[in-house]
Amino acid sequence: MNKLSLIPAATVLMIRDIDDGMEVLMVKRSKKPPFENLFVFPGGKIDEADKDINISNLCDGLNDQEASKKLGLSHGGLSYWVACVRECFEEVGILFAKKSNGEDLDLTGFEKEKYDNYRDRLISNEINLYDICIEEDLKLTMLNIAPFSHWITPNIETKRFDTRFFIAHLPNNQIEKHDGTAVSYTHLTLPTKA
C-alpha cells in the first residue's frame, strides 16, 4: 500500500442521550463527489489550517503530543481533533467550543445569527476557525471528542482516505442544521437504524 497517496481525514459520530438510549447524527451528502447522496457521518479531509500552531494554542485539554500518542502517530494528531471541530461547524453548525471563561456557547439564542454568519464565512474560506476563536474568545473543547476507530479506503478506490473516526456528545444549546452545500440533510437516528 502506498501511504503517500492516502488523504488524512476525520469523521465524527455525534451522539445525544434520549430516554431509550441514544441517537447518532447522520448527514446526507450533496450530489457532489465523493460520497454523493450517501448517508454518512460529518467529516472530511484535514486542511492545512487544521495543522496551524496558532489554533493548537486554543485547544482546551489536549496538545499535539497527547493527541498524537492517542492515534499512534509521531506528530500531527491534534490536527484530526481540529478538523473534527471545523467539519462539524461547517457541515452541521455544531461548534465544539466554550468561551475562555468556561461559559457554554448558546447557538440557539441571541448569538445564533452571528455564528451562522461565521459559519457561512468559514465555508466560503473568508475566515478560518482560528479567527473565529480569537474574535469570540473561544477555546475548542477537545476532551469532548474521543477517537475510536481507524479506517483506510480500499485499494480499489481512486481517491483513498486515511480516516480517523471519533465520537462526541452533542453540546447543549446547539441545533444541527445542514449547510446546503456539502450536506443536504441531517437526521438524528437510533444507531440500530443507521
Where are these regions (language model features)?
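The catalytic Nudix box helix
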Residues: F41-G43, A49-T141
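Glycine- and acidic-residue-rich phosphate-binding/metal-coordinating active-site segment common to enzymes
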Residues: E111-K112, Y118-S184
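Macromolecular interaction modules
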Residues: N2-A9, D17, K28, D52-S56, ...
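Short Gly/Pro-enriched turn/cap motifs at secondary-structure boundaries
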Residues: M1-L4, S30, P154-E157
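Short, solvent-exposed loop/turn segments at secondary-structure junctions
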Residues: K31-P33, I46-D47, I152-T153, N172-N173
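Conserved small/polar residues in nucleotide/adenosyl-binding loops
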Residues: T186-A194
